[in-house]
Regions:
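Short Ser/Thr-interspersed hydrophobic loop/turn segments at strand-loop and sheet-helix junctions
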Residues: 48, 72-76, 169, 186-191, ...
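Flexible, glycine-rich active-site loops centered on histidine and acidic residues
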Residues: 94-100
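Hydrophobic, small-residue-rich alpha-helical packing segments that form membrane-like cores
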Residues: 129-132, 147, 154-156
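A short, Trp-centered hydrophobic/proline-enriched beta-strand micro-motif
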Residues: 116-124, 168
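Alpha-helical interface subdomain recognition
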Residues: 1-78, 82-88, 100-105, 112, ...
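Flexible, small-/acidic-enriched active-site or ligand-binding loops
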Residues: 135, 189-218
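Short glycine/proline-enriched turns and hinge-like loops at secondary-structure junctions
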Residues: 63, 132-134, 158-163, 177-180, ...
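A short core secondary-structure module
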Residues: 150-195
Length: 384
């Protein structure tokens, strides 16, 4: 749903210029140094990128799902490392608070998240709880007017930059699976919370994932997200469902960048006395890339519009995440093929995108988990 096309166009134009003038020229430096300059993060905050999804009464832009996806399409044209900086505040790091937080929790944290003053992280995954998120072992034991948290969270995006963690922990050890899991708002400076060394990753250099270790970390009882224990897993699933649309839009944006780069290269690279774009086999690759990009974009916009109409989009979100994350991997592979040997060389940047996009098939639900969700929902609809 687009509420005011003129205002949205102004936002998209600003993001588009920022991507082309500030982010793309700094991609190689960020990848080499494995860090994003503070000056760029400050400009992201000035553009309002940290608060895209946060309600206006807390200082955010409160974009609709369709509007947010259109912005994500533009951000996706730059290295995904840049988008990841703001991505947790837009999505998994803030949405649990927006959806299920108490008024006092929202009043304190959301303005700080919207401005970029605080970066948030979503601490669900554990060493033995990846796709099986319901098997988390991190515990939260009530002790008077506080909780004591113990456990280790793994592969937590932006952990070393975060000022706030939404931590999923088990408050009822007797409950099986996802039952008995609660969500907590845990400040980074909490005694007993430590951050591990950033992992060495295949791609998306510039943003970091780390372990978050909770060793008798004491938080006030008021840090429980919402008002009831045992609602954490439900919150997590709602957050991830929404986040899959955003991630899908980012995948489509990256595919768009790779298609543009590949088409331009095919139009100027000469072999056998002519540009390679005149060869039908190269044209076939370009056509396949464009067709899949268009299909992915159409899926994302359709699902986003349905969500804006308050329709249930659990299946559609998983369809988008599954197709778009796989699609951008195929597009990146074809881009390397179009570039030939140059696509394998770092100077051209194509090999970097090839590595960067591999994670999209893994985080916020692997492709195989998306298949399970889609199929189970299809079968469930038969009995509804």
């Amino acid at each position: 749903m687009i509420r005011d096309q003129q205002i949205l166009d102004q936002l998209l134009d600003g993001v588009r210029r920022f991507v082309s003038e500030e982010l793309i020229p700094n991609e190689a430096q960020v990848a080499a140094q494995n860090d994003i300059p503070t000056s760029l993060v400050t400009k992201m905050a000035e553009l309002g990128l940290f608060g895209l999804s946060i309600p206006t009464n807390y200082g955010g832009l409160e974009l609709t799902m369709e509007e947010e996806c259109l912005v994500a399409l533009e951000l996706g044209r730059a290295s995904p490392a840049f988008r990841t900086v703001v991505g947790t505040n837009i999505g998994i790091g803030s949405q649990g608070l927006i959806m299920d937080g108490r008024p006092d929790q929202k009043d304190y944290w959301l303005p700080r998240l919207a401005s970029g003053e605080v970066i948030s992280s979503f601490a669900l995954t554990e060493p033995d709880a990846g796709s099986d998120a319901g098997s988390i072992r991190t515990s939260a034991v009530r002790d008077g007017d506080c909780y004591r948290l113990n456990g280790t969270k793994r592969f937590i995006t932006n952990a070393d930059k975060a000022g706030l963690f939404t931590v999923m922990a088990r408050t009822d050890p007797e409950s099986q699976g996802s039952r008995g899991v609660s969500a907590f708002l845990v400040p980074a400076q909490t005694p007993g919370l430590t951050i591990g060394i950033p992992e060495k990753k295949m791609g998306q250099h510039g943003t970091h994932v780390c372990d978050v270790v909770l060793n008798d970390a004491e938080i006030p009882a008021s840090a429980l997200l919402g008002t009831e224990e045992g609602k954490g897993f439900v919150t997590a699933m709602k957050v991830l469902e929404r986040g899959r649309l955003h991630i899908s839009a980012v995948c489509v944006g990256i595919a768009d960048r790779l298609i543009d780069e590949s088409t331009r290269y095919a139009a100027q690279r000469k072999q056998f006395g002519q540009v390679i774009g005149e060869f039908q086999l190269v044209q076939g690759m370009l056509a396949d890339m464009k067709t899949e990009w268009y299909a992915g974009r159409s899926m994302v916009i359709d699902a986003a519009r349905k969500k804006d109409l308050d329709e249930t989009v659990a299946t559609e979100s998983s369809c988008c995440k599954y197709f778009c994350s796989e699609m951008v991997g195929r597009v990146a592979d074809r881009a390397v093929q179009v570039f030939g040997g140059a696509g394998y060389i770092a100077d051209y940047g194509i090999e970097r995108f090839y590595r960067d996009v591999r994670i999209f098939r893994l985080y916020e639900g692997t492709s195989q988990i998306q298949q399970l969700i889609i199929a189970r929902n299809m079968l469930r609809e038969l009995t509804d």
